[in-house]
């Protein structure tokens, strides 16, 4: 017989998250006008304070040295399942996409300077970010087909291209952007690199919010025209954008 029950320590955390959602998050969310952005923001800020200072439920996926709970994949699965029962649940725990994945990526790939400038605000909940990889013409789930191109110009990179379904782009303080930097790589998976793009920036143009079956939820189409990014903002090594992207999108 296979026992699918959680270890007791994971079950304790799951129940803790469930109680928070039932006692605080769901009632607060249902009590406001959810179409009123100001009410939504105030509610999330208040609940985040409770999560962090009273409940001990903050950054469940990040290590303790970054203010997190240091949970592994099994515990995170339990936490995510409970938090997702209320639409703002992951936001309240500072464990929402796309920031959660970007936090992992910056932690693993970032230089000390990049971590302090970009990861620290994400962990403190004072900034949001986005991940810009998907393109409308060719590169959806296959990043070897990315056409957005970056070329070196002194101590900067100049980037041109077209992205869409970039979740969280509107209001983000920075983007992790995947662009092609190699015209003739040895293998297709070595063509791309990743850049940290400060936002807003000249050359980063939000065209529209691409609606899904449930409406518009800040999944943006982006035109990128002569966008200049400092060379110091390359995340990981040149040609490692595919590897970084796979790490970013993994569990």
What is the role of each PLM region?
Residues 148-151:
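A structural signal for short hydrophobic beta-strand segments in well-ordered beta-sheet cores
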Residues 125-134, 178:
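A short, Trp-centered hydrophobic/proline-enriched beta-strand micro-motif
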Residues 1-96, 113-128:
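Amphipathic, small/basic residue-rich leader segments at the start of a protein or domain
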Residues 4-6, 194, 204-251:
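Glycine-rich beta->alpha junctions and the first turn(s) of the following alpha-helix
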Residues 56, 79-84, 178-180, 197-202, ...:
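Short Ser/Thr-interspersed hydrophobic loop/turn segments at strand-loop and sheet-helix junctions
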Residues 93-113, 142:
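N-terminal glycine-rich flavin-associated loop
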């Amino acid at each position: 017989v296979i026992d699918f029950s959680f270890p007791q320590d994971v079950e304790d955390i799951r129940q803790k998250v469930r109680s928070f959602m039932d006692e605080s998050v769901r009632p607060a969310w249902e009590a406001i006008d959810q179409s009123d952005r100001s009410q939504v923001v105030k509610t999330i800020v208040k609940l985040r304070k409770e999560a962090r200072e009273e409940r001990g439920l903050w950054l469940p996926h990040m290590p303790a040295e970054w203010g997190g709970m240091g949970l592994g994949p099994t515990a995170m699965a339990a936490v995510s399942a409970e938090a997702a029962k209320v639409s703002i649940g992951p936001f309240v725990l500072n464990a929402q996409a796309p920031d959660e994945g970007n936090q992992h990526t910056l932690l693993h790939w970032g230089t000390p300077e990049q971590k302090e400038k970009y990861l620290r605000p994400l962990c403190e909940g004072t900034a949001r970010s986005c991940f810009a990889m998907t393109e409308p013409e060719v590169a959806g789930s296959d990043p070897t087909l990315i056409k957005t191109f970056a070329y070196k110009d002194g101590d900067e990179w100049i980037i041109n291209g077209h992205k869409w379904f970039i979740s969280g782009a509107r209001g983000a303080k920075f983007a992790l952007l995947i662009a092609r930097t190699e015209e003739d790589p040895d293998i297709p998976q070595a063509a791309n690199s990743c850049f940290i793009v400060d936002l807003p920036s000249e050359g980063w143009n939000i065209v529209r919010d691409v609606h899904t079956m449930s409406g518009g939820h800040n999944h943006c189409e982006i035109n990128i025209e002569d966008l200049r990014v400092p060379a110091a903002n390359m995340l990981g090594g040149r040609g490692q954008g595919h590897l970084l992207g796979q790490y970013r999108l993994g569990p």
